[in-house]
Every structure is written in structure tokens, then in C-alpha cells.
């Protein structure tokens, strides 16, 4: 099942929870969090408030995904918000241009639900990082809710405020299985086309070598 499952959605939509549930069912998959790429960049350059604005982040996110797929895992699970349309298109198109199968999932939830989840979230107890992360998430809450209507065709839209993590995972894996059938059919059609394009082999016997000398 070679595929990249990109889990998009607003902060508090349940991306990490769904990624964990999918990984539980697909233990050979790799969970790849592009946030780590941003934190790595911030070790070398001055933090800019949102690493998604960095062209290097967007380029490295694609390059890292391709390398992980090539060397380490057939299936990647990527929980990462891509709310800005241009950034989403740049990254997903970059993966598609490399002939990667990508299932783009967008988790929807009402603004009130997202707000409650963000207020209840504690990642680093007692640290200012948690408060800063909550404030960052709250700032773009309306934009994150509105983004659901702007997702490209082929996106799997799921309501994370109405479905359990297990039900969400069921929907994702059902779509992955369907895509895999289509991918297998496509490969079979391509193989048949190549066979038809090959020149037909002659049925005439091959001449012997060395040639037989003529008799007396």
C-alpha cells in the first residue's frame, strides 16, 4: 500500500489523534511530522513566527517525504495543517510531480469544538510554549474553519467533531484501499500498453552460426 496519507485541518481538529490511530493499525508505516523540519530550520535561522512562510521549509518537507518513502517506508502518515492554499498546492503538487500517491484528508470541526480542544490541550506542562501555541491556534481559528470549503478535488473531508478516531481511521483506510485498486489497475493497463507496443517476434527460425559450408 505505497501511499502518503496527509492529514490536514485546523489546530485541534484531531490530526495527531488520527495519525496515532492509523499508525496503530499500520505499524510498518512511518509517522512524519513536518513541524520537526521547521524546528530544525529555526536552529539555524532566526525564528520568524511561522516556519511555513519559509521556502526552505516547503522544499524540505517534500524532499524529506520523498526520501522517507524511498528508503524507509511504503506508507507515510503526515499530520500537518496546510491552511494556506498556495502552500498546500506547492507541497501536494511537489509530491504528485514525483509520482507519489497522496491521499489528502481534511478534518473539519466547528469553531467552538476547536476552541474547547485548544484550551484543554497541554503538551508541555508549565511551559510558556503551551500558551504560545494556544494563542497561535486561536488567532487563525476562523480561517481554519473556512478552509474546509476550499480544499481541492479528491480531498477526503471528514467531520472530526462527529466521528470517533476509530471511525475516522476506517474512512481513511477504506479510501486508501480503493485508491490502491485504481493504482494497481493503472499499472496493469500501462504494462499491457507496453506489451502491445513491443515489436512482434518473428516466428522464422534463426540462421545457424557459423553458417554451414555448401556441400561438394
Regions found by a protein language model. Give the residues of each.
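Small-molecule kinase domains that catalyze NTP-dependent phosphoryl transfer to phosphate-bearing small molecules
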Residues: 120-171, 180-209, 216
Amino acid at each position: 500500500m505505497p501511499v502518503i496519507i496527509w492529514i490536514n485541518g485546523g489546530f485541534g481538529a484531531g490530526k495527531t489523534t488520527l495519525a496515532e490511530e492509523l499508525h496503530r493499525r499500520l505499524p510498518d508505516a512511518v509517522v512524519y511530522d513536518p513541524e520537526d523540519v521547521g524546528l530544525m530550520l529555526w536552529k539555524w535561522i532566526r525564528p520568524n513566527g511561522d516556519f511555513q512562510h519559509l521556502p526552505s521549509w516547503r522544499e524540505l518537507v517534500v524532499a524529506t517525504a520523498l526520501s522517507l518513502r524511498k528508503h524507509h517506508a511504503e506508507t507515510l502518515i503526515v499530520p500537518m495543517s496546510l491552511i494556506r492554499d498556495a502552500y498546500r498546492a506547492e507541497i501536494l503538487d511537489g509530491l504528485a510531480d514525483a509520482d507519489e500517491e497522496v491521499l489528502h484528508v481534511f478534518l473539519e470541526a466547528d469553531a467552538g469544538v476547536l476552541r474547547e480542544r485548544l484550551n484543554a490541550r497541554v503538551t508541555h506542562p508549565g511551559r510558556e510554549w503551551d500558551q504560545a501555541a494556544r494563542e497561535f491556534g486561536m488567532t487563525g481559528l476562523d480561517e481554519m474553519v473556512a478552509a474546509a470549503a476550499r480544499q481541492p478535488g479528491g480531498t477526503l473531508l471528514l467531520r472530526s467533531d462527529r466521528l470517533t478516531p476509530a471511525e475516522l481511521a476506517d474512512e481513511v483506510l477504506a479510501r486508501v484501499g480503493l485508491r490502491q485498486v485504481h493504482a494497481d489497475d493503472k499499472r496493469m493497463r500501462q504494462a499491457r500498453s507496453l506489451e502491445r507496443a513491443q515489436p512482434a517476434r518473428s516466428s522464422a527460425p534463426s540462421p545457424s552460426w557459423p553458417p554451414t559450408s555448401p556441400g561438394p
